[in-house]
Amino acid sequence: DEAQFFTPEQIDQLRDIVDDEDIPVLCFGLRTDFQTHFFPGARRLMELADSITEIKTVCACGRKATVNARIDGAGHIITEGDQVVLGGTGAYIAMCHRCWQNKIREQENQLFIF
C-alpha cells in the first residue's frame, strides 16, 4: 500500500524478489501527484510490473477521475508545493482533468477581480 512513496531502487528490489525468489508481490498506490506528475516509485513500478489493474474513481461530474487534487481548508486547489507533505493538513479530491483545469482557471480569474 502507498507504493508511490517507494524509491525506484526499492521497486527494483521488489522486482528482484519476484524474479529470484519466485514470490509474488502486489503493490497498490497512486500514479501521479497533485500536479499530475508521476511519483518516481510509481513510474518505476509501471515500467517493471507484469500487470497493472487500475482501480477507477469517479469525479463529481460523473467522468473518470484522473487527478488527485490537493485542496486547502477553504476548498481551493493547491497547485504548488512539495510533492510529498508529511503530517500535512491538506486534503485530496479525485477529479477528472477537465474539472481540475476549470477549477484552477476559475481560481486564477478570481485573483483579478477587485
Which residue stretches match the model-derived regions?
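Gly/Thr-rich phosphate-binding loop signature of adenosyl cofactor/nucleotide-binding cores
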Residues: 1
